[in-house]
Amino acid sequence: MKTLTVSLLSALCLAAPAWAGQGTPADSVRHLQGVEVTARLRQEQGINPLGVPAKKLPLTISSLADSTLSLRAITQVKDALRFVPAVQMKSSFGAFREISVRGFYNTVYMVDGVRDERSTLNSYPLGDLYNVDQIEVLKGPASVLYGYAATGGVVNVTRRVPTEKFILGAHVRGGSLGYFDLGANVGGKITDGLHFYAGGFLSGGKQWRSTNDKNRSLFASLSYTKGIHNLILRLEGRNDFYGTDAGLAPVMEDDMYRVSDDKLYLKKGELLPGLKREWRYNDASDFMYNRAYNGSLKYTLSLPSGWK
């Protein structure tokens, strides 16, 4: 080990003068003018109103992103909320939806951070999710941040915002009982600072109990950014049809016996003779349309971080 050490030191001593004797290479450093790199972070209004990372707040928030909805082919709110813990949804008369969060049916429903005041009654039709970026659910006492009628929680749906990335998509899907849905969307950059997005969706089919429900929607969004100013215009229209359903007649709450001979007539949970679960229990002339048209214009002024 001692010999090896001496050899290495000798080699270094011999190499140093040889390197020093060589000519100094020409300076290849070029001085450039100052280069400024900037980026813009645009954050849409979510269910967290404080602007602080959720992991640092005592809030219980569950979210489903667009990638999750697309992967599971989810286009309806009732299907999306099945993947959120402590949230349930039930339907009445085929068209009306009731959302329960942690057992409470007082739930606020919002679109792009704006309350849908129909949620005061918590029984109303809901549109499709084809043009949605994400769904967020705020559970527990923190729901008081959104005012009255929010005992259970808050559901916020964020619709798509145009970006400069070009997108072009379409899909066609079919299922049992005659179900089908199809959609198409396109978006991208028009010019510097000006972006657009547009999408349409249609679903229908005979479906369970022959209700022939249909969802039809069109959505368009335009975004313009110049410096610290940003404008987002959203326009949406939908025309949904529901073949309302009163539901099954009550089943037997207990075993039923004949009075004449005291023999078992119907068991607990059975339907009355002649009724079928797949029938639609309503009049053919009883139906419902959900027509809705809305628009919004949002202006955002982004102040520099050093502004006081």
Predicted regions and their residues:
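N-terminal Sec signal peptide and the immediately downstream disordered periplasmic leader
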Residues: M1-R72, R82-V84
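A beta-strand signature from Gram-negative outer-membrane beta-barrel systems
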Residues: L129-H171
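Extracytoplasmic beta-strand/coil segments of soluble accessory domains associated
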Residues: R40, E44-A54, P58-I61, K78-R115, ...
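Short, charged/polar, Gly/Pro-enriched secondary-structure boundary elements
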Residues: L32, N106-M110, P162-I167
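Transmembrane beta-barrel wall of Gram-negative outer-membrane proteins
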Residues: I167-G169, G174-G204, R209-K267, L272-L275, ...
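Transmembrane beta-barrel architecture of outer-membrane proteins
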Residues: R72, Q76, F96, S119, ...
